[in-house]
């Protein structure tokens, strides 16, 4: 489903801190200043989003990533104008649009449900918004043709939606949202209904299209692979807050919090006690040395925002499974080394997963690339050594209780669940004019909204003045 509601940037760091790096004289495409959203339930305020400060650069592919209930879709709907912030301001291209209705915001929104008009062919669906704006004749044909070329659907211009695959329908919805040249495009899990192979293909195509048109894309997803594949930057959300904002590589390689380390990819978390601090560790970087067994070694460089540490402090060391090597003898050198016994072996094609129980009682996962096809390097029950470079591990402060995902009490559906696969899309009254609308004769000054309980069929839509 496409909808209408724009702006240009900055940077937000851990826990919602805000900095601006859009460049002198260049406003953020989308900027949130202290934005919060509470829902009133049984006479009390339930926070769904808690003070988000965020700035998205012009032409950036930016993702909001997090589990269901973290507030990412609620944040997106506030930007689109479908939800009103309880506190804070929303700016699009430097203009405060907090109180501006969705149809007055220069952004378009693509939902997981594409809501293509079944009585119109592909070209008609793409042209619909242009016709609503009074574009006619040669300009209409050229703009529709260019957009169909962009999404590689020119040869299917005369087909109806029912004659298209899921991926083709998704591209029609994308073309319909882009043809009006919005300042920014908001996408709420648009690939969620596609199968795995098609979803992976569409990720590459979507990023290529974004790069070609140069429009700011704000993408909401719970899928780490989607965010890592397509994004220039990612904001990881949890409990209504931004836990970390960084590039995909930094999010994966240098998580700032225990939640990010556990949510992004697979991480091994080892709780240990600080034995000593080395001000000049490997590479001259400050290093923390942790307690380990006889002949074992554990250390990691210190990164902000770890904070000051002292001997005896409890910390967690995190290391990714693919960074770990296995050997039958104790490895030489200054790297990390632990002994263990293999308790599980799972063959997954491109790699094999080994679960290793260390002598300290912690289970560690190892991903071993199957590059030679020679079979397993070790078997269940084998005693082995695990090793990795200290710079491949990361020290996190002692874990604290993590906030639970926000869910409204009682039978109320949490805001985040609205556009999941078994959902019906946004509430009835929030579809802006030149997105999901009725036949071409409708006056462009009129707002078209679906009648309660109806499908995406334009015949079921009514006019609201």
UniProtKB/Swiss-Prot annotation:
One of its GO terms (molecular function) is ATP binding. Transmembrane segments: none annotated. Its EC number is 7.6.2.11. The keyword Transport applies. InterPro entries: AAA+_ATPase, ABC_SmlMolc_Importer, ABC_transporter-like_ATP-bd, ABC_transporter-like_CS, Mo/tungstate-bd_C_term_dom, P-loop_NTPase, PotA-like, PotA_ATP-bd. It comes from the Bacteria. Keywords: ATP-binding, Cell membrane, Membrane, Nucleotide-binding, Translocase, Transport. Residues 30-264 form the ABC transporter domain. Residues 1-21 are annotated as: Disordered. It is a peripheral membrane protein. ATP binds at residues 66-73. Its main location: membrane. It catalyses: ATP + H2O + polyamine-[polyamine-binding protein]Side 1 = ADP + phosphate + polyamineSide 2 + [polyamine-binding protein]Side 1. Pfam families: ABC_tran, TOBE_2. GO terms for cellular component: ATP-binding cassette (ABC) transporter complex. Residues 1-18 have a biased composition (Polar residues). It is found in: Cell membrane. Belongs to the ABC transporter superfamily. Spermidine/putrescine importer (TC 3.A.1.11.1) family. The complex is composed of two ATP-binding proteins (PotA), two transmembrane proteins (PotB and PotC) and a solute-binding protein (PotD). This is Spermidine/putrescine import ATP-binding protein PotA. It comes from Frankia alni (strain DSM 45986 / CECT 9034 / ACN14a).
């Amino acid at each position: 489903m496409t909808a209408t509601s724009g702006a240009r940037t900055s940077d937000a760091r851990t826990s919602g801190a805000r900095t601006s790096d859009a460049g002198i004289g260049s406003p953020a495409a989308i900027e949130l200043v202290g934005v919060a959203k509470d829902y009133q339930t049984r006479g009390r305020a339930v926070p769904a989003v808690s003070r988000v400060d965020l700035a998205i650069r012009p032409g950036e592919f930016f993702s909001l990533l997090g589990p269901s209930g973290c507030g990412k879709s609620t944040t997106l709907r506030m930007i689109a104008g479908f939800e009103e912030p309880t506190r804070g301001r929303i700016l699009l291209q430097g203009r405060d649009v907090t109180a501006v209705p969705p149809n007055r915001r220069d952004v378009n929104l693509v939902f997981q449900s594409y809501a293509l008009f079944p009585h119109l062919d592909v070209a008609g669906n793409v042209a619909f918004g242009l016709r609503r704006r009074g574009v006619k004749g040669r300009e209409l044909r050229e703009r529709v043709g260019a957009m169909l070329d962009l999404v590689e659907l020119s040869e299917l211009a005369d087909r109806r939606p029912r004659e298209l695959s899921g991926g083709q329908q998704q591209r029609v919805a994308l073309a319909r949202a882009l043809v009006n040249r919005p300042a920014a495009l908001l996408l709420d899990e648009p690939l969620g209904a596609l199968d795995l192979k098609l979803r992976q293909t569409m990720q590459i195509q979507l990023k290529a299209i974004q790069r070609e048109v140069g429009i700011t894309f704000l993408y909401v997803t719970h899928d780490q692979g989607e965010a890592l594949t397509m994004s220039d930057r990612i904001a990881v959300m949890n409990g209504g807050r931004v836990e970390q904002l960084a590039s995909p590589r930094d999010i994966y390689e240098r998580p700032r919090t225990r939640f990010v380390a556990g949510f992004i990819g697979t991480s091994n978390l080892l709780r240990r006690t600080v034995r000593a601090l080395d001000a000049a560790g490997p590479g001259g970087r400050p290093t923390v040395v942790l307690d380990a067994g006889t002949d074992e070694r554990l250390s990691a460089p210190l990164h902000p925002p770890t904070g000051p540490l002292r001997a005896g402090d409890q910390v967690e060391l995190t290391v990714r499974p693919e960074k770990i090597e296995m050997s039958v003898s104790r490895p030489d050198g200054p790297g990390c080394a632990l002994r263990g016994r293999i308790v599980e072996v799972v063959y997954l094609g491109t790699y094999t997963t080994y679960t290793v129980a260390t002598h300290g009682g912690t289970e560690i996962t190892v991903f071993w690339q199957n590059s030679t096809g020679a079979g397993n390097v070790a078997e269940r029950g084998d005693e082995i050594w695990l090793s990795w470079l200290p710079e491949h591990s990361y020290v996190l402060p002692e874990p604290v209780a993590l906030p639970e995902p926000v869910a409204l009490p009682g039978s109320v559906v949490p805001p985040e669940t609205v556009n999941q696969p078994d959902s019906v899309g946004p509430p009835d009254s929030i579809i802006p004019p030149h997105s999901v609308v009725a036949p071409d004769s409708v006056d462009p000054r009129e707002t078209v909204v679906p009648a309660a309980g109806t499908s995406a069929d334009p015949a079921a839509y009514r006019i609201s003045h």
